[in-house]
Every structure is written in structure tokens, then in C-alpha cells.
Amino acid sequence: MQEPREQTLSQVNNPDASDEKPETSSLASNLSMSEEIMTCTDYIPRSSNDYTSQMYSAKPYAHILSVPVSETTYPGQTQYQTLQQSQPYAVYPQATQTYGLPPFASSTNASLIPTSSAIANIPAAAVASISNQDYPTYTILGQNQYQACYPSSSFGVTGQTNSDAETTTLAATTYQTEKPSAMVPAPATQRLPSDSSASPPLSQTTPNKDADDQARKNMTVKNRGKRKADASSSQDSELERVFLWDLDETIIIFHSLLTGSYAQKYGKDPTVVIGSGLTMEEMIFEVADTHLFFNDLEECDQVHVEDVASDDNGQDLSNYSFSTDGFSGSGGSGSHGSSVGVQGGVDWMRKLAFRYRKVREIYDKHKSNVGGLLSPQRKEALQRLRAEIEVLTDSWLGTALKSLLLIQSRKNCANVLITTTQLVPALAKVLLYGLGEIFPIENIYSATKIGKESCFERIVSRFGKKVTYVVIGDGRDEEIAAKQHNMPFWRITNHGDLVSLHQALELDFL
């Protein structure tokens, strides 16, 4: 049994010998292989260190060829039996768990890896050592390795470890499990920022919640105004162009009606024109005095409605009596005997802020329905008066409204009003002429106290220098202020200027 196997190995391991000596090969056909090997006396013995395990195949199957070995290797040497070591191979699967386990133990996709790819997943150090050896049980090794590395409860083990190789599904499951516990104490912590206890009992959170609700109801107008300012500032940051309008003789005809200059310029009946102007003036002061506290605020004029909002403490004004609070806009009352009643004092400024807050509420409520401030008779009278003025002025306001509405329709543009009229009468005038929807109250400025140029500076500081400003007016004040700030100025002197302005806006020149 040993001799035929040695004969086969000799033929495989000596291919060159048969090529170099053909006559010897022919002669060997008549002789037995065992005799040819035994008569070889020229063999020089070599030490066992000259041979590696790669030269000796330990495979039990003779028909599977090993890697060709050196032609100087002979199976008849005595060291052959001592170099065959099979025990290290038998314990190989247990020894490889130290480096075979880490690449696979943390993976949750074990079922997706085929068994035939086990060798590709062995570390580089192990592959280097395997390449120099010829293991007889590669397939068995791969199967044993996967069986040792993938227990049936691999998902549970991986979920409990804090491995960086967690899958997205497992991470999402862990987040959903921990999220409720992380969010539960948050409301109590936010409600009690000044509480010394880290985790207040639930019995303490209920009264504090009621206190928060009450505090929310009594929230100061300063904070409300700040939030409104923040909301408007976010909208202002998106603006690209701001149109600064004058009111009288630009959008509406009012002052020239009172003086009769309009009737003289356009050949109208002075009596009718002046009478219409006086009637409109009467309505303006009626609304200003009755609903907008002009009697109290005439001597306390402001440039903008929010100028005194910082003095408002947010008191509920539902049942507040403005007629009996002792406020005097012309100066302090000597009967108080303290600084709180003096003009500019804390109490006086607070009452002043109350009035401007109420003015804003009334304006916002009636900006699209000024008739709600008037009796039915006065409402009808206002409608007739506006129609008469529109006829007398040849649709001046209607022509200006075309440009105003076109600008308002643009998302990146805004209309801002700067007038030399005091703030409260200007608000009444805007409401009565039906311009409340065009000009929000925060976009209305009075230049009575500080002048047009200073108003322009405030507007530039609000909207920024990156915005393009276009000034539209009829007077020298607007023109000079526009030149000071390098703003283009569009002069309005007649109907043709309004028509040209609308055409320029339609063609996107402005």
C-alpha cells in the first residue's frame, strides 16, 4: 500500500527528470518503481529544517494534487514522517476565535454572508500564515468558524453592547426606548428654573402651571412687542426694496383742498373744494379725539407707535378707565405731590404707553373697516365725502393706489409712510382714506418732531443698508433727505407723475 503511493508522488514531484532523460523513462517501463528508488545511492541526506510543511501533503485524498514541490524532494527520506503534524490543524478553529470573532461578532447581518466567503474575512495576518501551509480541511474550517461566531442570540447580545458598529435599526430602537425617559422631567425643570430641588414633586408642578398660565395672560407688552418686532425683522430681512412715501399731496389731496390751491391750479370751484377739505378735516379730528386719545397725546407726540412700548408693564386694559386715571398730556398735576404724576415720571410714562398700546389695537382692528368707529350716519357721510373728493381730484387717490397695490403684491418690497402730520392725526387720516391695509401701523412714521432726514435714518437702521430705497414725494424736504442718503427720488406734482410711476413699476424699473 505504501509503495504505490510513493510511486505516484515520485512521478508528480519529478516532472523535469522525465523530460531530460527520455531513455531512462523508456527503460523504467520494464522495471518496477520500487527497485529504481531503492537503487538510488547518490542521495545526500538533508536536515529537517531544509524542508517545510508545504513540501509534504497531508491530504488523505491521493487524487487531489498539491502545490508542486521542489525536484530535490524525495518521499523516501527519514524526516518525512516526523514533519507531518496534524494536531495543530485539529485545534485551529478554537485558536482562530481570538481574531476571527471581532470582525463578525458585532455584525447583525450574519445571515447575509455566504459560508463560502469565510477565507476572505480572515485577518491579513492569518491569511499570510495560511498561504505558506496546506491545510487539509479548509471547508470544514470555514464551517466551524461561522458556527462559532454566529450564535442564535446574536441580535440580543449586540443590542446590549455599546459597540460602534450598531446598525441603524438597532440605534433607532434604542433611541425610541430612551426618548420618553429623557423627556419626562423636562417640563418640570423648565417650569421651576429657580427651584433648588433637582426633581420637584408633582404636587408642586400643578400650582406652578397655574401661575404660568396667569403670567402668560399678564405677559408684558414689552415682550409681545419684542416678539412682533422679531417676526417683522425676519420679514424685513427678506426685503430688497422699500418705497418711502409722503402722504399729503402725494398719495392723497388734503392740504391743498383746505388752502384752495388745488382748486386754483386745476380750475375747480374753490367753495366746493375747500368745503370738502374742511369736512374731511372734521372727521379726522373726530376719530383722533374720540378713539385715538388725541386730546391726551397732542403734546406727547411720538415718531413711531412703539417708541414708548418699553414703559408698558403689560397691565390688562379691558376694564381700565382712561378718563379717570389722572393722566395729563400737557404736564404734571401739582396735586399729586410726587414724581409719579409729573410728566416724564414712571407712572406718567406707563399711562402714556397704555394709550399708545390702545391706539395700536384700535388701528389694527379697524384698518379695513373704519366705519366701525363711526355712527351709521357718519359712515354714510364719509362714503359720500370720499366719492366727492375723488371726483374733484380726478381720481388722484385711485391712481396712486395702483402703484401702492402693485408694490404690496411684491414679496420683496414694502410701503413705508413718512408724514409731517402728527402721528395720531396721521393714523386717523390713513384710516379714513382707506389706506389701513396698505400701511401697517409699524410702517408709519411722523416727522413732526425730528424731520424727514432723521426718519430716513431710523428706517435705514431698521431695514439695513443692503435694501434699495426709493423716495416718492412732492416737497423739498423729501428730496433733500433722499439726497443726503443717496436715495433715488420720484417727484409727484400732477397726475402724469403718478401714471408714469405706475408704468415704471409695471416694467420693473422700480
UniProtKB/Swiss-Prot annotation:
User: Source organism's superkingdom?
Assistant: Eukaryota
Q: What tissue expression does the UniProt record report for this protein?
A: Expressed in branchial arches, CNS and developing eye.
Q: Which GO terms describe its biological process?
A: double-strand break repair; positive regulation of DNA repair; response to ionizing radiation
The reaction(s) catalysed by this protein are: O-phospho-L-tyrosyl-[protein] + H2O = L-tyrosyl-[protein] + phosphate
Q: Which residues carry this modification: Phosphoserine?
A: S199, S203, S375, S409
Please tell me, according to the UniProt entry, what happens when changing G473A: Abolishes phosphatase activity
What's one GO MF term for it?
histone H2AXY142 phosphatase activity
Residues that bind Mg(2+): D246, D248, D474
Consequence recorded when altering D474N:
Diminishes phosphatase activity by 70%
Stored InterPro entries: EYA, EYA_dom, EYA_dom_metazoan, EYA_dom_sf
UniProt modification remark:
Ser-203 phosphorylation is required for localization at sites of DNA damage and directing interaction with H2AX.
Point to the regions of Low complexity compositional bias.
192-203
Task: Name the principal localization, coarsely classed.
Answer: cytoplasm
Cite the effect that the entry attributes to T420A.
Diminishes phosphatase activity
One Pfam family, short name please?
Hydrolase
- Name the cofactor(s): Mg(2+)
Family the UniProt entry places it in: Belongs to the HAD-like hydrolase superfamily. EYA family.
Which protein, by its recorded name, is this? Protein phosphatase EYA3
Gene that this polypeptide is encoded by: Eya3
